[in-house]
Amino acid sequence: MTTDLSEDNTLTKPDGRNLRTDDSRKKIVSAFLQLIRQGTVAPSAEDIAKKANVGLRTVFRRFKEMELLYREMVIELENNFAPEVAKPWKTTDMESQLQELLERRSVMYEELMPYRVASNYHKYHSEFIQQAHAYWNVVVQKNLENILPFNKSSEPVLFNAIETALSFDTWLQL
């Protein structure tokens, strides 16, 4: 068990209730992500409680509404995949970088597919998911602009064609 030194320099022990709350919260988020990964686009609170091995009331106490679980999913995915998007290119020429971009995205898209399908299903009811998708679109667009010798403003048709070919939506159709 860990202990903290409080501001008045006395030794304090962590509160057991807070530890249980954090533990059950982590179990619920993990169960939610597992259910989506397994193909359940809209897991119910009952499914989550069963998978997390917690009571249904615990799910509702930790997450007053399901929207909060989708927020957790988005945050988790951003934390996992942002480093991959920000990783420097191994090569310097455009063709090789485009090939590397395609390889990275294909791996990422396969990992993201169940989560992205679930978030697409819920985005029309969630301002947060809509904002997260818009942010992600800007990130991947900037990623592509850093490779190409032109940008969306200078060559909109060509840029949009390449962007569409490399998009998650196109990958999903394959």
Label each residue range with its predicted role.
Residues 11, 34-43, 50, 71-101:
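Amphipathic alpha-helical linker/stalk segments
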Residues 27, 31-38, 84-88, 161, ...:
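Solvent-exposed, amphipathic alpha-helical segments
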Residues 30, 61, 71-72:
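DNA-binding alpha-helical recognition surfaces that contact promoter or target DNA
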Residues 85-90, 119-127:
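Short linear capping/connector segments at secondary-structure termini
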Residues 107, 111, 117, 125-160, ...:
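Amphipathic alpha-helical packing segments from all-alpha helical-bundle domains
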